[in-house]
C-alpha cells in the first residue's frame, strides 16, 4: 500500500428529503452490506414515527438528540515513563459527530423493540430527552475524563 499521500476526505452529499449531511451520515452508519435503500427507508420511517409521536419536526428532534449524545471530552492512553495514563482530551468536532452517530446506532441496535425503525425512533426520542443508552455512554465518557483530570498535564 502506498504511503505517499493521505487519502482526501470525501464530501458527504446532503440527503434529498431533509437536505442534511447529518442525516446522510446516519443513513451511512445504519447501512449494512451496501443496502442504502433499506437504510434510508429505516431512517425516514423512524423520522416519520418521531414526527407522529412528538408533533415536532423530526430533524430538530434528531439534532437535539445529537447535541445530547456528542461528547466534549474523552480519555486517550498515553505512555509516560513505563506506565500508561488515561489522559483527558477535548474531542475534535468531526470525531464528536462520528462518536455520537456510532453510539446512537449501537444503542438502537441493542434495544428490545421489534423493528429497527422503532428502535432508532425510540432511541432518538430518548436522547432528545437526555435519557437512553447513548446519552449514558456520553456521561460515562465524561465521568472517565473527570476522574482522570489529574493526568491532564500529560496532554500532547
Swiss-Prot record:
Annotated Gene Ontology cellular component terms: small ribosomal subunit
Record Pfam families: Ribosomal_S7
UniProt-recorded Gene Ontology molecular function terms: rRNA binding; structural constituent of ribosome; tRNA binding
Keywords of this entry: Ribonucleoprotein, Ribosomal protein, RNA-binding, rRNA-binding, tRNA-binding
Coiled coil: none
Record carries keyword Translocase: no
PROSITE patterns given in the database record: RIBOSOMAL_S7
Transmembrane segments: none
Top-level taxon of the source organism: Bacteria
GO BP field: translation
Function text: One of the primary rRNA binding proteins, it binds directly to 16S rRNA where it nucleates assembly of the head domain of the 30S subunit. Is located at the subunit interface close to the decoding center, probably blocks exit of the E-site tRNA.
PANTHER family documented for this protein: RIBOSOMAL PROTEIN S7
NCBIfam families found in the cross-reference section: rpsG_bact
Protein name: Small ribosomal subunit protein uS7
Annotated source species: Streptococcus equi subsp. zooepidemicus (strain MGCS10565)
Species classification: Bacteria, Bacillati, Bacillota, Bacilli, Lactobacillales
Gene: rpsG
Amino acid at each position: 500500500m502506498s504511503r505517499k499521500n493521505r487519502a482526501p476526505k470525501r464530501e458527504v452529499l446532503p440527503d434529498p428529503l431533509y437536505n442534511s449531511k447529518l442525516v446522510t451520515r446516519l443513513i451511512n452508519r445504519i447501512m449494512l452490506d451496501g443496502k442504502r435503500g433499506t437504510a434510508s427507508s429505516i431512517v425516514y420511517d423512524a423520522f416519520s414515527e418521531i414526527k407522529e409521536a412528538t408533533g415536532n419536526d423530526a430533524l430538530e428532534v434528531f439534532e437535539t438528540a445529537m447535541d445530547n449524545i456528542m461528547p466534549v471530552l474523552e480519555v486517550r492512553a498515553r505512555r509516560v515513563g513505563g506506565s500508561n495514563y488515561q489522559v483527558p482530551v477535548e474531542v475534535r468536532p468531526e470525531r464528536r459527530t462520528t462518536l455520537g452517530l456510532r453510539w446512537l446506532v449501537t444503542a438502537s441496535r441493542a434495544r428490545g423493540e421489534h423493528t429497527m425503525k422503532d428502535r432508532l425512533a425510540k432511541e432518538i426520542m430518548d436522547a432528545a430527552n437526555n435519557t437512553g443508552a447513548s446519552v449514558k455512554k456520553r456521561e460515562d465518557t465524561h465521568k472517565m475524563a473527570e476522574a482522570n483530570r489529574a493526568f491532564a498535564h500529560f496532554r500532547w
